[in-house]
Amino acid sequence: HCFGVVLATMNCLTHGCTEVMVERFNPLVVLASIHKERCTALYGVPTMFIAELNHPMFDMFDMSSLRTGIMAGSLCPVELMKQVEEKMYMKVTSVYGLTEAAPGMTATRIDDPFDVRCNTVGHDFEHTEVKVIDPETGEECPVGVQGEMCNRGYNTMKGYYKKPEATAEVIDENGFLHSGDLGVKDEDGNYRITGRIKDMIIRGGENIYPREIEEFLYQLEGVKDVQVAGIPSKKYGEAVGAFIILHEGVDMHESDVRDFCIGKISRYKIPKYIFFIKEFPMTGSGKIQKFKLKDLGLQLCKEQGIEIV
């Protein structure tokens, strides 16, 4: 929640702006607040904008006071950004970063061309450094070549509290924070995020670590092995997919898995897609090829007639 606290709340405090807050996200309350308070900027993750645009009472509210805003926290679909600009009358900007590089590493500007604001995450901030490196060699990548996004500057954390080893894993000897995200720098100095090195799932702006869910599902009687990976989602960007290998002779249904999860783990961590398979894609040395699970999930959805939402 660093994005909201720093770029919204602190920004309002330092600029003498009024901040209109809602107790918890509700698209109807947000729309009504914009209409009543004549808000000039709106922040949120893509799923929030989707909920607002698709609310049945959307046309009842006047959005003409909006000038700009930030869409961040997850990959922002170009079509969604177009709809926001057309229907909410605001110039959307985006910010890329992570809590360890608060409040971000790069950002687009309100005066950037629409194509830049929709298809890139903009330039690095003043007095900071961003570079794209080859994850294998550590060498900086040329323009147009994909690599890992790294950051150094006042926005880079000093380290994880009382965790020097964990800190050393992400901040190198030169002070660069390694994000684990893949990106590309274009000829104009704008960056585009292309994927993630890490296995983390980003569902509607919430970061989900597969291992946590895997360890939990291992406790379900009858589960022999389990892997969790992100499955593309039109609404959330990614959804949680669980790939389960059962012990021989065990009969289990998707509802059994979800019932086991309810009340024990956060609702957004409960797998949306559950697949019972015989084996995982493996390397010759016996390592699970986790990156192949996403494609496997899409294939299984197609074969089983499951709609991707």
Walk through the language-model features, giving the residues of each:
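Active-site glycine-centered loops adjacent to acidic/histidine catalytic or metal-binding residues
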Residues: G73, G97, G122, G153, ...
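Beta-strand->loop->alpha-helix junctions that form or flank phosphate-binding loops
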Residues: T93-E100, V121-D124, A229-P232, F275
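Acidic/polar alpha-helix N-cap and adjacent early helical turns
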Residues: D295-V309
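Adenylate-forming AMP-binding core of the ANL superfamily, especially NRPS adenylation
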Residues: L75, D115-K162, V170
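Short hydrophobic/charged patches on amphipathic alpha-helices used for structural packing
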Residues: V22, L28-L31, I50, F58-M60, ...
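Conserved AMP-binding loop of ANL adenylate-forming enzymes
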Residues: H1-V22, G44
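AMP-binding/adenylate-forming catalytic core of the ANL superfamily
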Residues: I34, L42-V45, G153, K158-G159, ...
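Gly/Ser/Thr-rich phosphate-binding loop
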Residues: T14-C17, L31, K36-G44, L53-V116, ...
